[in-house]
Amino acid sequence: MATGDRVQVILECTEEPGTSRYHTTKNRKNTSDRLELMKYNPVLQKHTLHREKK
């Protein structure tokens, strides 16, 4: 049985760290570098850049 290449990651807001976090999965084979996505921050009430946390 294959172990798979998908791994769970945490995305954290860069503008206000600690206020908004998202959990998602990514494929390590296709995206070896860290994810950066624009996601909604409910505390700031706007879309902000979220980066993959170590």
Swiss-Prot record:
It comes from the Bacteria. GO terms for cellular component: cytoplasm; ribonucleoprotein complex; ribosome. InterPro entries: Ribosomal_bL33, Ribosomal_bL33_sf, Ribosomal_zn-bd. Gene3D superfamilies: Ribosomal protein L33. Keywords: Ribonucleoprotein, Ribosomal protein. One of its GO terms (molecular function) is structural constituent of ribosome. The keyword Ribosomal protein applies. One of its GO terms (biological process) is translation. HAMAP family: Ribosomal_bL33. Belongs to the bacterial ribosomal protein bL33 family. This is Large ribosomal subunit protein bL33. The gene is rpmG.
